[in-house]
């Protein structure tokens, strides 16, 4: 029994022949589903081929006869006003933290990046997650799938039209352009860029229509334009509170990306590594003030800061072979290991580059982690941790799948691959409430209604992943299929797909 319901399990061990099957119990019958050795082989295609291209900010995105959106936010961005609490939870402190005055245009931010979710903001933490997971994907598997044309010079993306370049590398490039632009323009990584007016935050439809794409010029009247600038203050705001964890997150992402881009875009690869090293040096020479601690929130505790600094040292060491980074990494490793569950994925990524003594040191921690995975079987019939928080928990399930794969790679005798497949099975339909796949466009019965940029049409974006099941008090599992506007259940977000090391 789980929540208020009794569940039955079917033993598939007697099924040895590939084919199309259904399950039936009483008057309940599932949709037809395949059993084969290659069922997951193409399951990730829509996410790379469609979802990520659609989420690309500052680009015109076409799919055959359909235009998903124009090249939006070319007027990015104005420095956010000070002492401002934004309706979406963003904050700007009592100072800008840089040379720009409130509502002054910050040049160079109108490049790269992805819409974070169903709305149209750029959250830098999400950009970190995407760049890191794509860099990991490239270095682990060399994925050279090419189904998309992406031209940064013309700001043009066309879905299902190959251009002879690996899409993974082109997406890494797109994320790096935004992260590098932030540091070059402002001097450090920023929390992100968001709408300046509430009517824009509620905007449904083509993102290109949210602003006039002309940089705000306060010397012009409200509807006046000189062709390059306008007097309409509809530009997005850059929130610029400086925090160490955001800086280190950008350094981690750029250092990893520099390796992936080395042959594809050597110039950008060098620039990414230069900026990553600049951030490292700047953080070690910068005296943090109380304001920075305030806006770091839960990320300001010493243990977390040591762990993220260790991760930055690791990526920089891998990209440069500089012993100074390795020395700092070794100094901080004990803190990383003390928080094993939080840092399991990055520790697993370190193992192939460390000596056997480190692998032996980590082994008992992996054994304990494997024991905790076994205990999850007692919590529910699905063998994954189902969130009981206000926001549904597919993000954590995706993160667990990635972590379990990385640990299985080094400790196959300890981490059963079943712990990877359970998470995938859950995402593709084996979960409470209904048996729809939480990945739009993928699975026997995929989600057809989601909180994406096309939610007004009660539609979806192929390859997007929704948050999933929410447990309503006292014990009702829910995921609405008839109403896309519940973002805690149905919002298509970057973090539900790309969670390798994000805290």
Feature-to-residue mapping (PLM):
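Ligand-binding face of N-terminal immunoglobulin V-set domains in extracellular IgSF glycoproteins
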Residues: 1-37
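Residue-level detector of conserved catalytic or cofactor/ligand-binding positions
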Residues: 495-503
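Non-catalytic carbohydrate-binding regions of carbohydrate-active enzymes
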Residues: 56-95, 108-114, 331-494
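Asp/Glu-centered strand-loop micro-motifs enriched in Gly/Pro and often flanked by an aromatic residue
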Residues: 1-16, 100-122, 485-494
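Long, well-ordered core segments of solenoidal/helical folds
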Residues: 38-62, 171-187, 273-291, 318-341, ...
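Short glycine/serine- and small hydrophobic-enriched flexible loop segments
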Residues: 132-142, 252-262, 311-318, 348-353, ...
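Extended ligand-binding groove/face enriched in aromatic
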Residues: 51-126, 141-257, 264-281, 285-301, ...
